[in-house]
């Protein structure tokens, strides 16, 4: 499994934060271990979603604050908030390739409706998926 990171997410997080997030992401996707800070994992696919985002199968994971993780007994689907989302995509040809694109915060649901921002994210996903 290979996890790539955009320049954007590298600017949003410290090296230590990005390393920890990457380790959690690998553990989650490869081993099926749900970290305490990971919540609902879903494609952007509602009627307001930018078409390129849908086409490139861009997804997001709700993120809890490390100081206030999701309750362990709460089912993943119910682990939601409007604090932060990890935006990512999977390779189109290589299912073991993943791209961590950005952290949307604050108000990630509102940011996901920003066509300018989502178009940029869609272009990053498109470039990655054309290669992987």
UniProtKB/Swiss-Prot annotation:
Functional description taken from the UniProt entry: Toxic component of a type II toxin-antitoxin (TA) system. A translation-dependent mRNA interferase. Overexpression causes cessation of cell growth and inhibits cell proliferation via inhibition of translation; this blockage is overcome by subsequent expression of antitoxin YafN. Overexpression causes cleavage of a number of mRNAs in a ribosome-dependent fashion. YafO binding to the 50S ribosomal subunit in the translation complex induces mRNA cleavage 3' to the region protected by the ribosome; YafO alone is not able to digest mRNA.
Annotated Gene Ontology cellular component terms: toxin-antitoxin complex
Domain of life: Bacteria
Subunit structure: Probably forms a complex with the antitoxin YafN which inhibits the mRNA interferase activity.
Top EC category: hydrolase
Keywords: DNA damage, DNA repair, Endonuclease, Hydrolase, Nuclease, RNA-binding, SOS response, Stress response, Toxin-antitoxin system
InterPro entries documented for this protein: Toxin_YafO
Signal peptide: none
Induction line: Induced by amino acid starvation, glucose starvation, the DNA cross-linker mitomycin C (SOS response) and when translation is blocked. Induction is decreased in the absence of the Lon protease suggesting, by homology to other toxin-antitoxin systems, that Lon may degrade the YafN antitoxin. Transcription is negatively regulated by the cognate locus, probably by YafN. A member of the dinB-yafNOP operon; it has 2 promoters, 1 upstream of dinB and 1 specific for yafN-yfaO.
Its EC number(s): 3.1.-.-
MF terms in GO: ribosomal large subunit binding; RNA binding; RNA endonuclease activity
Name of the featured protein: mRNA interferase toxin YafO
One Gene Ontology biological process: DNA repair
